[in-house]
Amino acid sequence: MKNNIEYEKQQEEIRLHNKIDTFFDNFTIGTLLNKSGIRKMRGISPVTMLKAIFILPFEGNNFFRGIVSDNRQEFKKDAAYELLKGPRYNWRKLLLFLAVRIVCVLGLLTDKDRKKVLIIDDSTYDRSHSKFVELLARVYDHSDKRYLRGFKMLTVGWSDGASFLPLDFVLLSSEKEKNRLQGIT
């Protein structure tokens, strides 16, 4: 019985990895990474690292358990941190390229008469428990009608009424210097 459960678990993990591989292949994530300036500097390819990071929530893992303390990965945690923090990598461009490809696929699956819209949203990004985050500010939350620690998150997204895809986003601090709790370090 125990072997059967282990076998099913392994098969489910293989199916999940195959689905992620198919997604990365169908949307040519490697090409999009390259167009976004995210290239292999040394060691492991960025596609391999991004797949390993991308699959974490589907496996029920966080970054620490899936990358930092997992010795089965082909790369070390420092390589993953270097990929995510690379100052020359244009993650916003990657998001836009990927969103455009997904919008094209959704366009084939939906009715031509369906209305498509761009949505601009400025939600509050709450960081109430943070103290030393760069440009942390007191921002006004219009839904709760109070000030809180955090940022404004400006998001531009595409929607067809049933789906929403973020195209770009930015975290905004307060324009007023007196409302900023932390400066630039």
Q: PLM features: what roles do these ranges have?
A:
Residues 1-185:
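Conserved, well-structured functional cores that handle cations and Mg-NTP chemistry
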